[in-house]
A protein has these predicted regions:
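Non-transmembrane, aqueous-exposed alpha-helical and coiled segments at domain scale
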Residues: 1-378
Length: 378
């Protein structure tokens, strides 16, 4: 029997069995390896979630200490990857840089010639550790500043923000960022994860799968949406203008990014969590700027009332990242930094029971035709 989604885009088609992540779109539930995302966001660190997705279980205290040490030791970026960033930082867009720099990290990876599971676990750990350093180095270079070296004693989120901003974040900022990373770590069979699994199914290597996934995430219908959300908020400019602007956009049938989701038919649980963190950050924000949280909250009310659409994770991640002092065009690279562990875990899972992913297409072109011998090209 040949199955095809009535709506296209493989919607509703199951393409793999996975132990990593499950979504109940009707109830708004997201689970990583059996753990509800709300519990992980409240109690876990990003490092614990990385361990969970890669190793299958949450770590003990001793395992977590050892794992954090491994991650910290792998943060340093040198060789070709560092040279690539220094060369292109002034001209390359953030996702272009990251796509290229991640590929360059494969050149001197000690396991580059191995594709077994142990090697892929080590590659995954190194990618999780190095991508924040790549992003931080790029941001500092394009600002004309010296890169901030990773500090082994700092946790993932604190170190990441310090490399980006050149100063240590407040504890509340680091925790907010840590939660944002947790929320983006995996999300079942999205476009970039599917891309990674297709590449992995050819028995290609971990870095190739991740670079392909970055290419998929670059698109505005996937990872780039939070940048568009922030640009929309900036264009609106104030809480007082939200009603008029949003209603005009809706009347003109213009899409408002950050609303609706292919899977969720209710509030995206990740958006609900980030909304609370954005609100908390807004209470200590610079009064000279618009209240991005209040603007977002009012936009949510109008779009839900007028269109029946709920915000997705991109919507409140925009104001959250802005409050953390992160440039808008860097937002999608943060998505990569978080999601790389999900991609890597899917690559490992694909390799365990691999079959080449090779679907069919339905031909809708002309019927078979005879070649008109002698009547063409004369």
């Amino acid at each position: 029997m040949r199955l095809m989604s009535d709506k296209g885009g493989l919607e509703g088609i199951v393409v793999a069995r996975s132990e990593l992540c499950s979504i109940d779109g009707q109830k708004g539930i997201l689970v990583y390896r059996g753990y509800d995302i709300r519990d992980l966001a409240e109690h876990a660190s990003y490092e614990e979630v990385v361990y969970l997705l890669l190793r299958g279980e949450l770590p003990t205290a001793a395992e977590l200490d050892s794992f954090r040490t491994e991650l910290a030791e792998a943060r340093t970026v040198s060789g070709e990857a560092a040279q690539v960033i220094d060369l292109i930082a002034a001209d390359a867009a953030p996702m272009e840089m990251l796509r290229t720099a991640v590929s360059a990290t494969s050149f001197d990876d000690p396991d580059k010639d191995s594709n077994d599971e142990d090697a892929n676990q080590r590659k995954a750990l190194r990618l999780v550790a190095k991508i924040p350093t790549l992003i931080g180095r790029y941001q500092r270079r394009r600002e004309g500043k010296e890169p901030v070296d990773p500090v082994p004693e700092l946790d993932y989120a604190t170190n990441f923000l310090a490399m980006l901003r050149g100063e240590l974040p407040a504890r509340e900022e680091a925790r907010t960022f840590d939660v944002a990373m947790i929320l983006h770590a995996d999300h079942e069979m999205n476009a970039s994860t599917f891309t990674a699994r297709v590449i992995a199914s050819t028995l290609s290597d971990m870095h190739s799968a991740v670079v392909g996934a970055i290419g998929a995430l670059k698109g505005p219908l996937h990872g780039g949406a939070n940048e568009q959300v922030m640009k929309t908020l900036e264009a609106v400019g104030s809480v007082e203008r939200v009603d008029e602007d949003v209603r005009r956009r809706l009347a003109e049938h213009r899409r408002i990014m950050g609303f609706g989701h292919r899977v969720y038919k209710t509030m995206d649980p990740r958006a609900a969590i980030l909304k609370q963190y954005a609100r908390a950050l807004s209470e200590h924000a610079d009064d000279s700027e618009p209240n991005w949280y209040e603007m977002s909250s009012r936009m949510e009310e109008i779009v839900l009332a007028e269109k029946g659409l709920y915000p997705n994770v991109d919507f409140y991640s925009a104001s959250t990242y802005h409050y953390l002092g992160i440039p808008t065009d860097v937002f999608t690279t943060l998505f990569v930094a978080s999601r790389v562990v999900g991609w890597a875990a899917h690559v490992i899972e694909q390799h365990r029971d691999n079959r080449l992913i090779r679907p069919n297409s339905e031909y809708v072109g002309p019927a078979r035709r005879a070649y008109p011998i002698g009547s063409l090209g004369s």
